[in-house]
Amino acid sequence: MADQLIRATAADGGIRAVGVITTRLTEEARQRHKLSYVATAALGRTMAAGLLMASSMKRAGSRVNVRVKGDGPLAGILVDAGLDGTVRGYVGNPHIELPPNARGKLDVGGAVGNGYLYVVRDIGYGYPYSSTVELVSGEIGDDVAHYLVTSEQTPSALMLGVFVGAGGVTAAGGLLVQVLPKAARDEALVAKLESRVGALSGFTPLLQAGKTLPEIFHDLLGDMGLTIFPESQILRFHCGCSFDRVLGALKMLGEAELQDMIVKDDGAEATCDFCGRVYQASSEHLTQLIVDLQTESSVSG
């Protein structure tokens, strides 16, 4: 099944639902960063959460940054997701592995530890909106749901899941169901929805059982006036890094540092944290940067 995002509404627009399948892009992240099992689960959940949050943004080019900063051995997570369906991300310690937790599951909470969740929404106007909440469990789903309730005042049910087998990621994705203000006062509706979400065994078991996103929506909201939007959105792992950006970053180091790199290393190597791509800048590239800096200095002087 292709990685995709599907939107739906129910209760005359009082309930908003978004589902994502992110199996392939999570596997790509695992391969790019050579992630351990628990690191794959942690990053995969956070990427799915980022895509779900970005889906509610309106302006083209809007993006959301999700940073999980905990005191656990994973050493943090950073994800950048866009309304356009692209996502990228990395963890601080990609090779960490822990024993299963008390439920026999990958111990994402133990890997993340205690700390904070930072969310920055950039809608393209130059004034990003940022918010911080304390981590509830470190399991990502609980933490993002807590953010949505406390920072956006929107009652939300969030399910995230990643299943990693011996051959890689076989199922990944998430589901976000939000009760909007027009329906939040209907206590019976909210209770009914909470009961149904709570009865689910998890998101990845549904995918492994062959359930599609529309079928999951029907199981949850089929008798609540469900409307599924016919257009699905393709999701993919994508990083906007480039050699030109690397040269721009190297140029900011200044003439003396660049000259030192030429003498000691005969060039420079840079690795993109988000996608793991390695860039090589030769001594000729660095020499040209020095020439550019000298030219700019003489012009400005």
From Swiss-Prot:
UniProt PTM comment: Under oxidizing conditions two disulfide bonds are formed involving the reactive cysteines. Under reducing conditions zinc is bound to the reactive cysteines and the protein is inactive.
Keyword terms of this UniProt record: Chaperone, Cytoplasm, Disulfide bond, Redox-active center, Zinc
Keyword Transmembrane helix: no
InterPro entries: Heat_shock_Hsp33, Heat_shock_Hsp33_C, Heat_shock_Hsp33_N
Assigned GO CC terms: cytoplasm
Disulphide bond pairs: 239-241, 272-275
Keyword Oxidoreductase: no
GO molecular function: protein folding chaperone; unfolded protein binding
Compartments, as annotated in UniProt: Cytoplasm
Pfam families: HSP33
Principal location: cytoplasm
GO annotation terms (biological process): protein refolding
Protein purpose: Redox regulated molecular chaperone. Protects both thermally unfolding and oxidatively damaged proteins from irreversible aggregation. Plays an important role in the bacterial defense system toward oxidative stress.
Entry similarity comment: Belongs to the HSP33 family.
NCBIfam families: PRK00114.1
Protein name (Swiss-Prot/TrEMBL): 33 kDa chaperonin
The encoding gene: hslO
